[in-house]
A protein has these predicted regions:
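Extended, charge-rich helix/loop segments that form flexible
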Residues: 1-30, 35, 39-54
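Catalytic binding pocket for nucleotide-activated donors in carbohydrate/polymer assembly enzymes
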Residues: 23, 48, 56, 61-180
């Protein structure tokens, strides 16, 4: 809550600043992709406007142009219903939370439930509630320059990734399914 105003007024202020959140998220996500490219981590980009970003990256990152053309794919927007199949065919999903840093976004449980390691910036809630060995890997927004290297080392260890996937699926079934 903002000091001196009610919860309703706080919600109104947050809604007024919604586009600032969207802009900040876009800038952070672009930096993450830049770091993945610099570390030669193949990536598929889902969502809108990645084609515009990639056009700029091809101009600004000429040293990585061959890698970009071969290993960075823009897949466009997808529906929510398509996500389980996408996660099921991916080894990992890189997530950046909206600016509610005390909660969780459904991308993390959805990734884990579909056999995909979730790599995310995390939140106070996530770090408190989700054990380190549960298929979730955290990166720091304060150290975005290291995220590409971290992800590259994670995916290079195939055996460890398989273990993380198995633990993630189990954790998701235990904690986030209707079965419990």
């Amino acid at each position: 809550m903002y000091p001196g105003i009610s919860g309703v007024q706080t919600a109104e202020k947050l809604q007024e600043n919604f586009m600032a959140d969207v802009y900040i998220q876009a800038a952070i996500r672009q930096e993450i992709v830049v770091q993945l490219i610099r570390n030669h981590v193949p990536v598929k980009l889902y969502g809108h406007n990645w084609d515009t970003f990639l056009t700029k990256a091809e101009v600004l990152m000429k040293d990585n142009l061959t890698f970009i053309k071969k290993f960075v794919k823009v897949c466009g927007e997808v529906t929510y219903g398509e996500l389980p199949a996408i996660y099921n065919n991916a080894r990992f999903s890189v997530n950046q939370l909206p600016w509610f840093k005390a909660g969780i976004h459904d991308r993390t449980p959805l990734a884990l439930m579909n056999g995909c390691v979730s790599i995310t910036d995390g939140s106070t809630y996530m770090r408190r509630e989700i054990p380190m060995d549960s298929g979730v890997e955290y990166y720091s927004l304060d150290e975005l320059e290291n995220v590409g290297e971290k992800i590259k080392s994670l995916v290079a260890d195939v055996g460890s990734m398989k273990e993380k996937v198995a633990r993630g699926v189990q954790y998701a079934e235990d904690m986030w399914s209707w079965k419990h």
